[in-house]
Amino acid sequence: MPEFLTVVSWPFLILLSFQVRVVAGAPQPWHCAPCTAERLELCPPVPASCPEISRPAGCGCCPTCALPLGAACGVATARCAQGLSCRALPGEPRPLHALTRGQGACVLEPAAPATSSLSGSQHEEAKAAVASEDELAESPEMTEEQLLDSFHLMAPSREDQPILWNAISTYSSMRAREITDLKKWKEPCQRELYKVLERLAAAQQKAGDEIYKFYLPNCNKNGFYHSKQCETSLDGEAGLCWCVYPWSGKKIPGSLETRGDPNCHQYFNVQN
């Protein structure tokens, strides 16, 4: 497993941020790695036929061609064109989960008027996709996995840099107020989260180099590990992913580390 600073699971951080206000005067948040001239020189050219150039998603530096109406999209894909937003497909049972896997579609933004290029049926589908996401956001029964997906939609970017640092400040505030419910977490991934919070709270007080890569435990709603684990990168390069045993978080022997999908399900297929 890569030796990077480990950070806490995002669902837990999101829950903390809803419970306690962020400490005033918190240290500066971690930033995306700067787009140096050397990095920009490595960017592939945008095709001349591209109708609209879009800024990169997340911490990327290279401009991309904006996605058109109806194109597949997600958290890690290029951005949708102006007037469009990336939404889960109508009827998708796990909208946020689908968006983290690039299984959404570019549709008209809720406030955007329909255009002549969009048929009546397409317009209704676009509205249905928006409605499904709105209903999910209002549901009081959001699971921890959905909260994880929700955070990935707010992954660190040049527009949203304070999320991680503010969450750590929130934890420090809880500690100062002697809120000790954190110690009730018993499952393996949950225990790791608590230890990581302790380390991050301490690291917050120290000055040093910027952190551009870190591993964040990917926990399920029961407090165990998802079989697929990935590092998070703030330098524009895709992080490594690998496969683990859900009950321990230990890497599966012989499994690959890749910047794509390691296909962890292959190690759990039951042979008949």
From Swiss-Prot:
InterPro entries: Growth_fac_rcpt_cys_sf, IGFBP-like, IGFBP1, IGFBP_1-6_chordata, Insulin_GF-bd_Cys-rich_CS, Thyroglobulin_1, Thyroglobulin_1_sf. The modification Phosphoserine is found at S139, S157, S169, S255. Induction: By hypoxia. Residues 115-143 are annotated as: Disordered. Its main location: secreted. GO terms for cellular component: extracellular space; Golgi apparatus. One of its GO terms (molecular function) is insulin-like growth factor I binding. Disulfide bonds join C32-C59, C35-C61, C43-C62, C50-C65, C73-C86, C80-C106, C189-C219, C230-C241, C243-C264. The modification Phosphotyrosine is found at Y171. Residues 132-143 have a biased composition (Acidic residues). Keywords: Disulfide bond, Growth factor binding, Phosphoprotein, Secreted, Signal. A motif (Cell attachment site) lies at residues 259-261. The modification Phosphothreonine is found at T170. Residues 28-109 form the IGFBP N-terminal domain. Binds equally well IGF1 and IGF2. Interacts with integrin ITGA5:ITGB1. Interacts with VHL; this interaction inhibits HIF1A degradation. Multifunctional protein that plays a critical role in regulating the availability of IGFs such as IGF1 and IGF2 to their receptors and thereby regulates IGF-mediated cellular processes including cell migration, proliferation, differentiation or apoptosis in a cell-type specific manner. Also plays a positive role in cell migration by interacting with integrin ITGA5:ITGB1 through its RGD motif. Mechanistically, binding to integrins leads to activation of focal adhesion kinase/PTK2 and stimulation of the mitogen-activated protein kinase (MAPK) pathway. This is Insulin-like growth factor-binding protein 1. The gene is Igfbp1.
